[in-house]
Every structure is written in structure tokens, then in C-alpha cells.
Amino acid sequence: MAGMTSAGNQHLIRTDLWSRQIKELLLDDLNAMKFVRMISDFPDGQRINSPSIGEAEVADFNENMAIKYNALDTGNFQFNFDAYKYSANAISEKFKRDSYYASDVIAAFPQREHRALMVAVETDILAKANAGQTASNLNTINGGNHRFVGSGTGASITLNDFARARYSLTKAQVPLNNLVAIVDPSVAFTLGTQANLVNLMTPNPQWQSMVRDGNTTGFKFMFNIMGFDIYISNYLPLVGSETINSVSVTNGVANYFFSASPGDTMPWIGGFRQMPTVYSEFNKDLQQTEHLTIAEWGFKLYRPENMVTILTSTNAAA
């Protein structure tokens, strides 16, 4: 007489087994805020004004000549709190009763919503640098070009582009310490496969204090070339097609080169009108618990002289 077998007792066998652990998404690091001069001295209003004073002039003096008194040039830098964003989710009472994973889902709401807002912040900061320059223009400052297309084959990056970025920052009187390059993964691929660059790569960050102090902690550091600590970001703005000084790029991305010297030298300025704030409440009419994270912020390119944008094609890694 046959005993119990799997074939004859399928109704007693669990065909599908469910893991207690929920598969998490792989998340990259968000650190653009490290390069922002954050301000907080605003009790009310939507627009921040920051006055500036120009340089004094020097003139030749001759005897019996009246001195000419000049006024210093002045300016006013403005930026607005232009982003008011939220992330919201809800979970029904029935789902709480029915789902084995209900507690895990509820616990994930605040951190996932906060993460979503910070991705929006990261994207906004990086986009503001590109928006702060004039497209299809060299954006020349003191004779140095602050926006140009990569000089390599197919608008890829080359060692010459690093030298040009350093030259432009020097002409703009930017401190050449704490130099940082934030590049697209396609640029990292190009750099890692160019024989003439591999020998110039330093495997450790040159600006050790930046890593120690947290200025660039979290970015995926690659190597150092010509004084630039190179980091990779997936959130750099795409520029599509653009022609600068008769050189064109298609499927372009904006890569940034600048000095991360702390204080007033930082290339970006910005602040939060409302820090990410979490709200939760039960909606008795819909029989669901609602979770909301909301924030208001504004960012802008603060020092155009401390920003060199090199446009490269993402096709370089294809």
C-alpha cells in the first residue's frame, strides 16, 4: 500500500514560499548639498537678496591735477525658494490586516519619502549650475572658458579638458585647493579606458581633509587627475544637443569642475524654507493611514567663476 506522496497531496504543499525579508533597491549616494553655501537667516519672504561690492580702481596722478573720486560698483544677487515638493503614501486598514509585510511597509514610508525628496534636492542643485550658464556659449570669464564641449573623439573628455578647466578657474582667481570634478558614469568609463590617462590617475583623494571633514564623503570617488578629485553622479543634467564655438555634442551631459573650498567660495547657494517634515494621520472616511513628507527649498549657482562645465556625450560609453 502506497504512503503519502507529493503527487497525491498537492493541497497540503505550499507551492510558493515568501521570504521574510523584502528586497531593497540599490540606492546611490546624495551629496551635492556638501557644495552649497547654506543660509538660514530668513524669517519670512520668498526671495533672498545678497548685495555685492566691486573692486576699487587705480588711476595715474599728476601734479596740479584734481583727484577724481569714483564710486564702487555694486550689485544684488537674488534667488528664490522655488521648489515646494512632497512625497505621500497611504496604507489601508484592510491591507494592514491582510498583509504579512504590513509592518515593514509602514516602517519604510518615512525613510523612502525622505529619500525621494532628497533625490529631488540633489537633482535640483546640479541642474541649477547648468541653468546658471548661457547655453551654446563659452561663458568666458577673465579670458577663461567656463563652458565647452569635450575635445575628444565623439565629444568625449581628454586630459586637455582637465588642463583647460584648471586654467579657467585660475584666470577667475578661484582658489586651486579642494578641486572637485563631478562626472557622469560615461565619463568615468572614458577616463578608465584611456591609456594616456591611466598613468596619471592617483588612486587616493588628494584633498584628504575633504573626505575627513565630510565635504565629499559618500560620493563614489574614482581617482585624482591634475589635482581634481573625481566623483561620479547619476544626477547630472542632460543637455541633449548643443554647439559651442562650432563644436557640437549630442546626447550630452553636463560635468562640473570647481573648487570646494569652504565658505563664500562654494559654487552654489541655497537653503530650506521648510526642512523635510513628516506628518501622519488616520483618515476615518477612507479607512487608511496617510503619511506625508513635505519640504520647501531654493538653490542657485552662486559663483559662476567657480564653475566650469564640460559637455560630453553619453554615447562615449556605448
Can you describe what each PLM-predicted range is?
Residues M4, R115-S156, V249-V253:
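Signature of extracytoplasmic/envelope-associated structural regions
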Residues A135-D213:
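Extended, solvent-exposed, turn-rich assembly/linker loops in the middle of proteins
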Residues S50, N76-L138, T170-P185, I230, ...:
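Long, contiguous amphipathic alpha-helices that act as assembly "spine/axial" helices in icosahedral shell
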Residues D73-F77, D104-I106, H114-A116, P205-M210, ...:
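Glycine-rich loops and low-complexity Gly/Arg-rich segments
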Residues D44, P175-N177, M226:
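Short, well-ordered loop/turn elements at secondary-structure boundaries
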Residues E57-F61, T190, G240:
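Short, solvent-exposed loop/turn elements at domain surfaces
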Residues D44-Q78:
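N-terminal low-complexity, intrinsically disordered segments
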Residues A2-M33, I39-F42, S50-E55, N80, ...:
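Sequence/fold signature of self-assembling virion shell proteins
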